[in-house]
Amino acid sequence: MSKDKLWGGRFTQPTDKFVEEFTASIDFDKRLYHQDIRGSIAHARMLGKQKIIPMADVEKIVQGLQEILAQIEAGTFDFSISLEDIHMNIESRLSAKIGEAGKRLHTGRSRNDQVALDIRLYLRDELVEISAYLELLIDSLIFQAEKNIDVIMPGYTHLQTAQPILFAHHMLAYVEMFKRDIGRIEDCLKRANVLPLGAGALAGTTFPIDREHVAELLDFPAVTRNSLDSVSDRDFALEFLADASILMMHLSRFSEELILWSTSEFKFIELSDGFCTGSSIMPQKKNPDVPELVRGKTGRVYGNLMALLTVMKSLPLAYNKDMQEDKEPLFDTIDTVKGSLKIFADMIREMRVNVATMRQAAAKGFSTATDVADYLVRKGMPFRDAHEVVGKSVAYCIAEKKDLPELSIEEWRSFSDKIDEDIYDAITLEASVNARRATGGTALERVKAEIERAKVGR
């Protein structure tokens, strides 16, 4: 018989040593210790309130669990692989400390609903922290936007110069992305923040428990409504992994731009030395390792989403041991996202913008060609005709190695007699930027308003 196992009563042979090691999860689920103890204390108090176990036992259980919590946080608690997981390690130690009272703790619950509770508690805490990290990153973006409020840079499509924009406008684009990420995290929290404890192994419990009381003790606004779903649901974890994948995609896109902008070919920005590394052979190198690594870690998070989706895709109701594989993808993603956000927020705040280089780049590539077309439209020309006229003028400039502002008025009028001296005022970088005053545009007055809106709306 497996005498050392809390579930060993029906077994006549000990667990194979390799099986014990293969099935144990304590190496990674021990990080749930705080949530496991919080859940157990709430469960014990409910059992006492409902007169399912004596209040004297409840006090012993609570005190014992608090002592175990202190031991774990002090690093003096010895975790055992033979006890499989965090739940059994804590319960076994509790029973050893306080005797029979500790054996009453598991009344009316299963490890199935216990672990579901622990993961929800853990994720709930982490979602709040991730939202806070996102807010810090948004703060850094707003800081850069305000610091460089009137800096003009080229905007791109297909990575080709398109139209001039404000650098601040570009920073605010990422503010919008990360605000959506916060919204998704908040939505995920709504679905994670539901109490599963009380579902038992799969069918509920025969004891007169009060699930709503446990929910109140643990600050859950609601309890789950179906015991089968309660123990088999990992949608909230999958939803977080999907949200995290989108979040990391945003960081990866930003990383790619920072990597490009910091090259000697662009020279738009300079990252602080503290966020870069050198080369072991090339002494001149300053490598943007942080954005490169964040870009690389994005694939890791995508993989975690695929891993858990694959684990869950064919599981019959209710709990299956496969679901033990939910924790490592979840924990790894949480660690990756938090680390990436923290370092990104600090890196962006310390980033230096090369104002002159950005402006010089914005003045190249016929970036105000659309403004010429808009000018002709305001003079009465249909847009498609204006588009063709400007296309021909650009072709002429390429052949003559000129830019649009360098054309004489005679050259301009060779393309259209609607063009007058005021064309030159219409195609300056400032005129191009500030003409785009509609909501969402890059005009200075609009960008300033959006910065204030971003501050107030948080």
From Swiss-Prot:
Enzymatic reactions: 2-(N(omega)-L-arginino)succinate = fumarate + L-arginine
GO cellular component: cytosol
GO MF term list: argininosuccinate lyase activity
EC number: 4.3.2.1
Keywords: Amino-acid biosynthesis, Arginine biosynthesis, Cytoplasm, Lyase
Enzymatic class: lyase
Disulfide-bond pairs as recorded: none
CDD domains reported in the protein's UniProt record: Argininosuccinate_lyase
One family name in Pfam for this protein: ASL_C2
Pathway info: Amino-acid biosynthesis; L-arginine biosynthesis; L-arginine from L-ornithine and carbamoyl phosphate: step 3/3
Subcellular location: Cytoplasm
UniProt-listed GO biological process terms: arginine biosynthetic process via ornithine; L-arginine biosynthetic process
InterPro entries cross-referenced by the UniProt entry: Arg_succ_lyase_C, Argininosuccinate_lyase, Fumarase/histidase_N, Fumarate_lyase_CS, Fumarate_lyase_fam, Fumarate_lyase_N, L-Aspartase-like
HAMAP family to which the protein is assigned, alphabetical: Arg_succ_lyase (MF_00006)
Similarity comment: family membership: Belongs to the lyase 1 family. Argininosuccinate lyase subfamily.
Protein name: Argininosuccinate lyase
Organism: Geotalea uraniireducens (strain Rf4) (Geobacter uraniireducens)
Gene: argH
